[in-house]
From Swiss-Prot:
Record flagged with keyword Heme: yes
Organism of origin: Chironomus thummi piger (Midge)
Family: Belongs to the globin family.
Annotated ranges, domain Globin: 18-161
A Pfam match: Globin
Subunit structure of this chain's protein: Homodimer.
UniProt protein name: Globin CTT-VIIB-8
Entry binding sites for heme b: H76, H111
């Protein structure tokens, strides 16, 4: 859960350039379209970046095909996606900015303790965006909203790593 909480990064709207209500709506609706695919999201990230998989002790060094259909994998994927869903749901409302900042700050602190690098957060971002592009209605407006949300998230997380 810890690493994919990174996904949560994607949704902050609580920094210098918070998401507008329209941008938050685009992020939320596109996320809603895929958030039930927890296992597929995590598997896509691991397939694209095995170094991320190796940050998870219970999955490190194992063949993705052999772990993808296990209960442990599904449970972990659900934890990650649930965290991301919480952050995404809070985005776009100025009164939630402090809550989002707290969640994302803790994410950065927790990942620093695990030795996760800014580069690995970047890999996660790339894999997540690729998954979204392949599985939701994706246009320039959706891409811009996700990029802004992810930029905002990284502005909080990266300095804490």
């Amino acid at each position: 859960m810890k690493f994919f909480a990174v996904l949560a990064l994607c949704i902050v709207g609580a920094i210098a350039s918070p998401l507008t209500a329209d941008e938050a709506s685009l992020v939320q609706s596109s996320w809603k379209a895929v958030s039930h695919n927890e296992v597929e999201i995590l598997a896509a990230v691991f397939a694209a970046y095995p170094d991320i998989q190796n940050k998870f002790p219970q999955f490190a060094g194992k063949d993705l095909a052999s772990i993808k259909d296990t209960g442990a994998f599904a449970t972990h994927a659900t934890r990650i996606v649930s965290f991301l869903s919480e952050v995404i749901a809070l985005s776009g409302n100025e009164s939630n900015a402090s809550a989002v900042n707290s969640l994302v700050s803790k994410l950065g602190d927790d990942h620093k303790a695990r030795g996760v690098s800014a580069a690995q957060f970047g890999e996660f971002r790339t894999a997540l965006v690729a998954y979204l592009q392949a599985n939701v209605s994706w246009g320039d407006n959706v891409a811009a909203a996700w990029n802004k949300a992810l930029d905002n998230t990284f502005a909080i997380v990266v300095p804490r790593l």
